[in-house]
Structure formats: C-alpha cells, structure tokens
A protein has these predicted regions:
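Alpha-helical transmembrane segments of integral membrane proteins, especially early/N-terminal helices
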Residues: 2-18, 44-48, 79-90
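Alpha-helical membrane-associated segments of multi-pass integral membrane proteins
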Residues: 6-11, 103-139
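Hydrophobic transmembrane helix segments
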Residues: 15-53
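Interfacial non-cytosolic loop connecting adjacent transmembrane helices
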Residues: 31-46, 90-118
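Canonical alpha-helical transmembrane segments
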Residues: 51-71, 129
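Loop-to-transmembrane helix junctions at the membrane interface
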Residues: 64-88
Length: 144
C-alpha cells in the first residue's frame, strides 16, 4: 500500500518556501544578490547549516524513493531529479567548480536582462512545490 510519510508534506512545503523567498529578488535585486553572494563567499555558519539541512533532506527523499521503488507516488520522482540536482549544486559550490561559479555569478547579475525569468521560474517552482506539500498534508490526514 502507498503511504505518505509524516515528514513528506513538510519537505515539500520547506522547499517551496525556500524557493518563494526569491520574491525578494524581484523586489530588490541588489540586496538579494549581495546577501546570497555574501553567504556563498563567506561560507559561515549560516551557509553550513543551510547546506547541511538541504543535503540531509535530499538524501532522505532519495532514500524514501528507493525504499518504495515498487510502490511510489508520481511526485516522489521529484526526490530523484530535484534531490540529485540540489546535491550536485551543493557539491559544485563546495568544491568551487568554475563553470558552476560562473553560472551563479550570471544568475546573480543584477543587470541581466534574464533576471526576472531566472528568479520568476524559481518562484513558480516554489509555489508549485509548496502547494504540492499542502495537498500531501491533506492526503496524509485522510490516510490516518
């Protein structure tokens, strides 16, 4: 039988909110870019706590997908594709992979004509993932 684990709706709502914070980037490009570039360059406690939480959640999601390989919901594929992407992203940032650093600098270029497209996409993704989490929370309550 398919089961939604207690933490799964919160997983999606957390990632959704994390993406939705990018609305700040549409409101104030400079402070948003300065904040995140500062976090990425300083690699202070906030950086390591955030990266640790993101990595832990991705590993949990991928493990859950694998554990339920024969009886998965469609949305658990997000764990594989999204989790793999985030883990690669965290790894590339940690080892300061040049091509990835160049991509991040492009993404945080406040003068880029693509700024609203890039961050708008992440905001839409965040809204979708947050709504998915809310839907899963409702379905989980119906399962109990």
């Amino acid at each position: 039988m398919k089961k939604i684990y207690e933490w799964e709706p919160w997983f999606f709502m957390f990632f959704g909110l994390f993406h939705l914070h990018r609305i700040w980037g549409l409101i104030d490009r400079t402070s948003y870019a300065d904040f995140w570039i500062g976090i990425l360059e300083s690699k202070g406690i906030f950086y390591f706590v955030l990266m640790g939480i993101l990595a832990f959640l991705c590993v949990c999601g991928i493990a859950t997908f694998c554990k339920n390989i024969k009886n998965n919901y469609w949305w658990r594929w997000i764990y594989i594709f999204g989790g793999s992407y985030v883990l690669f992203d965290l790894f590339a940032i940690a080892i300061e992979l040049k091509v990835w650093n160049d991509l991040l600098l492009f993404m945080f270029d406040v003068n880029s004509q693509y700024w609203n497209i890039v961050w708008g996409f992440f905001i839409i993704l965040g809204a979708f993932v947050f709504c998915l989490g809310m839907k899963l929370l409702k379905q989980r309550k119906e399962q109990i």
